[in-house]
Amino acid sequence: MFGGKGGMGNLMKQAQMMQDKMAKMQEEIARMEITGEAGAGLVKVTMTGSHSVRKVEIDPSLMEDDKEMLEDLIAAACNDASRRIEENQKNKMAEVTGGMQLPPGMKMPF
């Protein structure tokens, strides 16, 4: 079924190597910082790969504007950063898995 003993052993070795690569990739993802923007860069939010907000930058020109608009821009920048993190994680994991597609809704790690 697996090409004899060597085949199964090789399969297990490959699985272990992939698991090790994934662990390293997860550490790298957690350390990375991604910046999302809104209002053509007037509001920027920097998040870690684990979705913790590290920094919020607001262009001084917005401080005179309407509070509700500023709140909307901050929320939009957070959402943009989060989307970029998800996209980056997907790309990094594709490197580890060799482009293996996961079923819809399933995220790595399992």
Swiss-Prot record:
Name one matching Pfam family.
Answer: YbaB_DNA_bd
> Where located?
Cytoplasm, Nucleoid
SUPFAM superfamilies, sorted: YbaB-like
One annotated Gene Ontology cellular component of this protein: bacterial nucleoid
Region Disordered, annotated ranges: 90-110
| GO terms, molecular function | DNA binding
Does the UniProt entry include the keyword DNA-binding? yes
| The entry's keywords | Cytoplasm, DNA-binding
Entry superkingdom? Bacteria
Keyword Cytoplasm: yes or no? yes
What does this gene product do? Answer: Binds to DNA and alters its conformation. May be involved in regulation of gene expression, nucleoid organization and DNA protection.
Question: What family name appears in the similarity comment?
Answer: Belongs to the YbaB/EbfC family.
Identify this protein by name: Nucleoid-associated protein Sden_2380
Species annotation: Shewanella denitrificans (strain OS217 / ATCC BAA-1090 / DSM 15013)
